[in-house]
């Protein structure tokens, strides 16, 4: 199996590392999913070369708290004054109608928008894990997007929701997703 190497050439390098200086013009060599080298005039004959001149090259950002299942509802209530009014509408009135496909689409939309904004790692605080199928759909969306994620499984917030499936489901999910080679992991919210 060959691992892809990518060389970003001539970019403005922000290392975010006290031991590696920023460069006004420099290169970054990525091997697979890891930064292999940072410096001026790097060479890698077998690498895909991307001209980064005039662009900032830096490690991906981390979003430590996001409710990705709400992605399709963003900007729905921009002028809400009371958080509890928002929760009432989202959790009590809308969230309970989500199907697994809705979880997939919303989570995928949010993951791709995050990647587009430079966020490569995210903690997804999901409080709409209505069933194992809902959780599987959200996890599939995260995996397919390519983002690194910790999906925090949480009970749905509406009065009719049941969380009885969560203890057994969390064991199943942990066995399936919490492996050393997975970009997506599972925890409890």
Stretch-by-stretch model annotation:
Residues 1-44, 56:
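N-terminal metal-binding scaffold of metallo-dependent hydrolase/deaminase domains
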Residues 92-129:
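Hydrophobic alpha-helical hairpins/lids featuring a short glycine-rich hinge
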Residues 26-27, 48, 186:
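Extracytoplasmic/periplasmic beta-strand context in beta-sandwich domains
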């Amino acid at each position: 199996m060959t691992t892809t190497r990518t060389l970003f050439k001539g970019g403005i390098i922000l290392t975010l590392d006290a031991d590696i200086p920023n460069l006004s013009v420099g290169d970054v060599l990525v091997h697979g999913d890891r930064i292999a080298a940072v410096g001026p005039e790097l060479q890698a004959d077998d690498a895909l070369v991307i001209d980064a001149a005039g662009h900032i090259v830096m490690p991906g950002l981390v979003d430590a708290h996001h409710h990705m299942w709400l992605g399709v509802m963003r900007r729905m209530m921009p002028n809400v004054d009371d958080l509890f009014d928002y929760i009432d509408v989202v959790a009590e009135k809308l969230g309970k109608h989500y199907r697994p496909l809705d979880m997939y689409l919303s989570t995928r939309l949010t993951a791709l928008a995050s990647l587009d904004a430079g966020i490569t790692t995210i903690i997804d605080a999901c409080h709409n894990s209505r069933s194992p199928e809902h959780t599987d759909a959200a996890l599939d969306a995260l995996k397919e997007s390519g983002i690194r994620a910790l999906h925090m499984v949480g009970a749905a917030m509406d009065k009719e929701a049941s969380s009885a499936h969560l203890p057994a489901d969390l064991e199943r999910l942990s066995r399936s997703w919490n492996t050393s080679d997975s970009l997506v992991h599972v925890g409890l919210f």
